[in-house]
From Swiss-Prot:
Entry-linked CDD domains: CYCLIN_CCNB1-like_rpt1, CYCLIN_CCNB2_rpt2
Stated family: Belongs to the cyclin family. Cyclin AB subfamily.
InterPro entries recorded: Cyclin (IPR039361), Cyclin-like_dom (IPR013763), Cyclin-like_sf (IPR036915), Cyclin_A/B-like (IPR046965), Cyclin_C-dom (IPR004367), Cyclin_N (IPR006671), Cyclins_cyclin-box (IPR048258)
Species of provenance: Oryzias javanicus (Javanese ricefish)
Protein name: G2/mitotic-specific cyclin-B2
GO biological process, one term: mitotic cell cycle phase transition
SMART domains with a match to the protein in the record: CYCLIN, Cyclin_C
């Protein structure tokens, strides 16, 4: 779903507002009331006055003007206008050099209309705006009866339900996004937390899936702890609380874009997906924007697998430099260490990514390396 517009915004503006060249480039500006006088009357008045008296010719003998001699080494004086023009030319040249340093990753996609190469820059600019509008506050459950441990338990169970129903990856991320967005504006009791979670997945399925499971399937998956009527009733509460705004950008959208920019292989992309999915259980990462999480996941993935730094192209297209992503990468490293060393009982994501279908990415030795351990320890010893 990713690609960048082949026509820049400046070119679009130039096409819509072409600059006139030649004589018509700038219309003569008339003085106030200067062109609404009677020109014929003015000409007649001049005729009445008669011919003007001839002015005496100036004498041929002119007073000699002093000549200023400048040495060859003295620079010629530069006017203010010329100086400003030089600065503008230098600034434009510098900008062009920067643009040349960044490769256009979508220039080869013009013949593939499904990649929207002409609009992809505007699309991702809009997604960045949208994720800010639908942000999640840090520590939003402060003062709730529901704890971060209960939330992690619920999300771990939802990962298993997601695998059981064989749903799309987008459905899982949207489920957790709906859960957090709803809980931050509508606190619930512990008894209803699972009801909110399973209903959030129902709403996400209706939004993402072609053939979503039925309400009865979700009632069954809870061992009939909740009835179909309760699930439908909670669905209405969730939708009203969110104002029916479900189109929050997902980390997967930005990860696919980032992988295209980096020309990442399947292993790097899959490892980044694993790192991203582990963040779903981490309550202390809910406030990070999806674009930030996706960029940090790929940055950590390529660092672990190939030791590659965050490139200029990746910084340009993601809008984040490596220094900005570092604290997010440290939190991701902490999650990996906890799962790898068995410090947590929430292992649904690790088990999911230990399958051959997902390249057994959660079992690779790089996740137990000194690199990731040092990064995780940096949180304890900043």
């Amino acid at each position: 779903m990713s690609s960048v517009e082949a026509v820049t915004q400046q070119q679009l503006l130039a096409a819509e507002n072409p600059v006139r060249m030649g004589k018509g480039a700038a219309d003569p500006r008339r003085a106030a009331l200067g062109e609404i006088t009677n020109r014929n009357a003015a000409a007649a008045a001049n005729r009445k006055m008669g011919p003007s008296k001839k002015q005496p010719k100036p004498s041929c003998a002119q007073k000699p003007q002093p000549v200023v001699h400048t040495s060859a080494g003295d620079p010629a004086p530069i006017s203010a206008d010329m100086s400003m023009k030089v600065e503008q030319d230098l600034s434009q040249a510098f900008s062009e050099v920067l643009m040349l340093a960044v490769q256009d990753v979508d220039e080869q996609d013009a013949d593939q209309p499904q990649l929207c190469s002409q609009y992809v820059k505007d699309i991702y600019k809009y997604l960045h705006t949208l994720e800010e509008q639908q942000a999640i506050r840090p520590n939003y459950m402060q003062g709730y009866s529901v704890t971060e441990h209960m939330r992690a338990l619920l999300v771990d169970w939802l990962v298993q339900v997601h695998s059981r129903f064989q749903l799309l990856q987008e459905t899982l991320y949207l489920t957790v996004a709906i859960l957090d967005r709803f809980l931050q504006v509508h606190p619930v009791s512990r008894r209803k937390l699972q009801l909110v979670g399973v209903t959030a997945m129902l709403v996400a399925c209706k939004y993402e899936e072609m053939y979503p499971p039925e309400v009865g399937d979700f009632a069954y998956i809870t061992d009939d702890a909740f009835t179909k009527f309760q699930i439908v009733e909670m669905e209405q509460v969730i939708l009203r609380s969110l104002g029916f705004q479900l189109g929050r950008p997902l980390p997967l959208h930005f990860l696919r874009r980032a992988s295209k920019v980096a020309d990442a292989d399947v292993e790097k992309h899959t490892l980044a997906k694993y790192l991203l999915e582990l963040t779903l259980l981490d309550y202390h990462m809910v406030h990070y924007r999806p674009s930030e999480a996706a960029a940090a996941a790929l940055c950590l993935s390529q660092l672990l697998l190939d030791g590659l730094p965050w490139s200029l192209e990746q910084q340009h297209y993601s809008t984040y430099d490596e220094q900005h992503l570092k604290p997010i990468m440290q939190l991701m490293a902490k999650n990996v260490v906890q799962v790898t060393e068995g410090r947590t009982k929430f292992l649904a994501v690790k088990k999911k990514y230990s399958s051959s279908k997902l390249m057994k990415i959660s079992l690779i030795p790089q996740l137990n390396s000194s690199t990731i351990k040092v990064m995780a320890e940096a949180l304890q010893n900043p």
